[in-house]
Amino acid sequence: MSKVRILLADDHPYFSDMVERILGSGFEIIGKVDDGRALLDAAMRLTPDLILTDISMPVLNGIDAVDELRKQGCPSKVIFLTVHADADFVRTCVAAGAFGYIVKPRVAADLLVAIRRVLAGHLFISTYDADERGLA
């Protein structure tokens, strides 16, 4: 069976490198980009199985990029990896075409499970409660 082909979009290289380490050798990273416009170009050119993207990026944000990819017929599944834990962001991302939403503090714990669920056609939304935010 061939490896899942992933395009990674985040404007913080340290975070992208961490995600790549979490994924390990079980996946093929076919591209890494650092802004939404580059995400559009790479996704249409490379047709990844899965796109892992941030919301807040320069040039074009991740939500608008994913919305545009859907309009252009890109079949790639999308999981957002973001600092935004607000439910409004989750709804907006799902409406734009995302199948997954992980808040960055939960990436190490949730990413591999999220990928399996999303590739199986299910929605995955990570939880991030007050205890994890240090608010409890």
Language-model features: locations:
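Active-site residues of response regulator receiver
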Residues: D54, T82
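Receiver (REC) domain active-site loop signature in two-component systems and cognate sites
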Residues: M57
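Active-site beta3 strand of CheY-like receiver
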Residues: L46-L52
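Two-component/phosphorelay signaling modules centered on CheY-like receiver
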Residues: P13-G31
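Conserved sequence signature across two-component system core domains
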Residues: A9-D10, V33, I51
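Short acidic/polar segment at the start of the alpha1 helix of CheY-like receiver
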Residues: H12-S16, F89, I125
